[in-house]
Amino acid sequence: ALPISWVSGGCFRGMEMVVENRTPEDAAQIVQRICGVCPVSHAHSSAIAAEKAYGIKISNNARIIRNLLEGAQFLHSHILWFYNLAALDYVNPLNALKADPADAYDLAQAAGTSMNSDFVALKERLANFADNGQLSIFSGNWFDAEDGTAYQLPPELDLICTAHYLEALTMQAKASQISAIIGGKMPHVMTLVPGGTAFVPTDQKLDELKALADEIYDWVESTMIPDTLAIAPYYIDALNWGKGCGRYVAWGVFEGPGDYASYTEQMANRYLPMGVIDDKLNLSDVQEN
């Protein structure tokens, strides 16, 4: 039995203390400074907290606009993490110097991934990078090591993925453009306020948003997903690295339409609903209300 239970965390940053005795509008702006990658989520959390406190129900249009803003951040974050923050853990640009560009085109076609980049020109660019010798944090048993690294990809796939790594810099910026149009700027949006949004949609803005979203969608379908499927077989063993306890929690995102009796009910009816996966949890052991 568990007569007393505690929950603790090791990531206290004190932002709640910073916003004490400030107006709700201030809080929504201040807490975003926690992160330059995911400020929208922090702003949303602050605005929702204020709305709960004051009993405010936002309009359906405001709900849609907030979901679009959160979705743009999702697009940016997924592209950023898969390519620009993590890809160099499994993609070796210097190994791409051994690639035959013609074979790289054949492999890209076979893998169903895009061939928008000039692989010949990229290989020349990488050669200049290697000749420069200034590999920064990647020097010493990283890109330039023959042994002792965990890189598994063949040279042609390294060349393809390096090209797409560079393309991803542009694509994640386009996702941030969507956030900037809706939020006034990105990072740290300005239009997200308790009670709704200060963004005023126009035909021109909506057309621009649609064009950017379509471009990102096409790139993810033609590049990011095929790249993932091409890379994964070389790192199957990594699926067991850093394996945790098998307990997962999600708070949900993208508020659905309608009125809900409680905030918990609203969270459960999000397009990506909240939930917990924990096969080891036995609630019968919990005796607290």
Model-based region annotation:
Residues 1-289:
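Active-site bordering "gate/hinge" segments
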